[in-house]
Regions:
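Conserved catalytic core of the tyrosine transesterase superfamily
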Residues: 1-204
Length: 204
């Protein structure tokens, strides 16, 4: 099976493709020309190459299932993502980013600083960091357990000494029960994915 988030992504992709392909047509009516026209329409609409590649990947998976079930013989070519160079932080920017905020900063700014440090140290996914609970952090062993992973399996990850020190101080301020979320809102609740994204952008 796939995660709820993956299913939601598939639904969104198919909804977007519906503007470029008649989703009401039967398999008998679906042709290679129709698929080619869909790709041409996507390109003309100004959709980025990487987005088209993502849409095509989902639709190709759907067609693969349809072929296995005997509904169609059609397939969609593999569209490569257009390589883009992502900017990285300079040493000066990284030092400024990781500089600890002033002691009189509010909880959100302090929490965001800890989150940025954690992400740089671990590189974990947004869904993973949002689901970490206080009890998942073992400061004595310098390890953290990821409950929410892409594979659905628990994962134990080591912490560097500096990150363990940062978390130790943060957790003494954050407090809360073992089952509470480590990186929470000011009300002690789980941060939404959008809230986490906005918090990181605002801190940057």
């Amino acid at each position: 099976g796939v995660s709820d988030k993956t299913v939601l992504t598939y639904n969104r992709h198919f909804h977007s493709l519906g503007y470029h392909l008649d989703m009401t047509m039967t398999f008998d009516e679906l042709t290679k020309e129709a698929l080619d026209s869909m790709l041409v329409s996507l390109r003309k609409s100004g959709v980025s190459s990487n987005t088209i590649s993502s849409y095509a990947r989902v639709f190709r998976t759907f067609l693969k299932w349809c072929r296995a079930e005997g509904y169609t013989d059609l397939s969609l070519p593999n569209i490569q993502d257009k390589e883009t160079v992502k900017g990285s932080y300079t040493d000066e920017e990284l030092i400024a980013l990781l500089r600890k905020p002033a002691k009189d900063c509010d909880f959100c700014e302090y929490r965001n600083w800890v989150i940025v440090n954690f992400l740089i140290n671990s590189g974990c996914r947004a869904g993973t960091i949002r689901n970490i609970q206080n009890r998942d952090v073992s400061l004595s062993d310098k390890r953290v357990i990821y409950r929410h992973t892409k594979t659905g399996k628990l994962q134990s990850v080591p912490l560097c000494s500096q990150m363990a020190k940062i978390l130790s101080e943060y957790m003494s301020i954050r407090g809360g029960a073992p089952e509470d979320y480590l990186f929470c809102t000011v009300y002690g609740e789980m941060m939404s994915e959008n809230a986490l994204s906005c918090a990181i952008k605002k801190y940057n």
